[in-house]
Amino acid sequence: MSVSRLCLLLLLLSLPAQAVTLHGLLRHQAEQQPLLLDSPRYKTSAGETFAITRASWLLSGFALQRGDGSWLELPENVAWMDAAKKCAQFALAEVPAGRYTALRFHVGIDAAANAANPAQHAADHPLNPNVCGLHWSWQGGYIFLALEGSWRGADGAPGGFSYHLARDANRTAIVLKGDFDLTGDATAEIEFDVAKVLKGAKPLSFAKDGVSTHSQPGDPIAAALVANLPGAFALRTVTSHVPGIARVSEVKPIGLPAKFTPFQLKMSSTFPIPPLPRDNPLIEERVALGERLFNDTALSRDGTLSCASCHPRERAFADPRKLSVGVEGRVGTRQGMPLFNLAWKTSFFWDGRAPSLREQALIPIQDHLEMDEALENVVKKLGKTTREHFAHAFDSPEVTPERIGLALESFLLTLTSHDSKFDRAMRGEEKLSTEEQRGFELFMQEREPRMGSMGADCFHCHGGALFTDHQFRNNGLAIDEADLGRFRVTKAAIDRGTFSTPSLRNIAVTAPYMHDGRFTTLEQVLDHYSEGVRRTDTLDPNLAKHPEGGLHLTAEEKRAVIAFLKTLTDRRFENH
């Protein structure tokens, strides 16, 4: 061999191996068929009919086995899978090219990640609580697998189940053997049969074993889930086909002025990082314009109403009336929601029909029962009074509906609430009373008599630093055919009678309560969840798992929970 060829060979050997990407494509299955959500067609080993409404889980600890039996660890990768949200892909990048004999991953995350501060994660990170909805709030730690749904026993009586697998000891390794040809980018298609989680090596019966688990030590349901998980996964194929991935295009800010001042958004260090709009960065000039427009009666047809008319600042921007009232005294159909911590929401109104704040802000202006004004008329009126303000907030003084929406969005995004007595207590600046502390413990504790846990179970829907999960739920009110909530938007049967979960921050000053303002006091709200829950087909599983009527709280428990709820009032609204 010539010296030149030898040098070339040595050079090639010294170069790093080619890096490839292994894509994972999950297929949610049930009884060897594609999973159909909210479909009571599946059977437990005990013959109980059940439906799945939620299958959400975390994956981590990825590794590939080499031919010699050693493992290539890929520890930085974390993925969130969710059947309802259609989250079913992951990608393992920078994998050395070659052939591997197995893929390993874990359902759940490692102890360090589980104990870490969830507020550290980027707005789009799988472990951001606002993304995955799987962080266990002030208790700490993540839910590794959330499996929820409805079921019926032999007597046909409806019920709900809520299985939450969590805690470090229950992190479960899954090993899928196969021929992983990664000489180039490839895709591993993986089946996850949800039904096998319930009827695998240790089959579960809702009637016999129980309808909920929070994975307390020694819980046999959690142990059964861990035993069943490995058998629920199967490797279908490994191919060189790579799934199409939508590339994120560059987003340019809309109409920024030549000179502007960035706005410093204030929020608690416990809050998740919010997904702020990249095309509408917060600047002081645009926020100021948005606040001016929020209080401008020119947005209404007869000049009598502004946004603030139904959303007064002193009531945490909530409407104190049962139903909102528009121009000429026209009564609306729903109660006006409070307007704070909106930066963490991705859909707006009680039914979620607006996908952004800029769109939401323009709807009441045009609604016949609210401001009842045409946008072209608003543009004309504002063009006579606010062009100078638009010139400061945008790259020209032009007034347009889009710019009105962007300015209102900017202002609304800045309305954060994070300085309550509870927040100060968490910072060590104040101390909760004995009754308030008892209420906090009840709020954050599951009600699971099977395991001796008798909490108020509030945290499932109202957990986390924001005290809401931003989901749509049927919370046990009788279904009104005149207002079916989220169903109006999606037309999905599972959404009949579901409405947006409101934050419980400032709850003491945002009465009346519910989408129709039916309850005027917190006592009435607690009575509803204690004894007044109506069992319907779409009742949320976290309520349907309880006995007929609800939680059946004692008078002392109700008082304690209410005492805690009153600690969630921001100091800006405490003197209302």
Where does each model-flagged region fall?
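Sec-dependent signal peptide recognition
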Residues: 2-9
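Sec/Tat-exported extracytoplasmic proteins
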Residues: 63-66, 104-107, 151, 198, ...
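Short glycine/threonine-rich turn/loop motifs
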Residues: 252-363, 423-541, 574-576
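C-terminal capping alpha-helices of c-type cytochrome domains
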Residues: 375-419, 508, 518-576
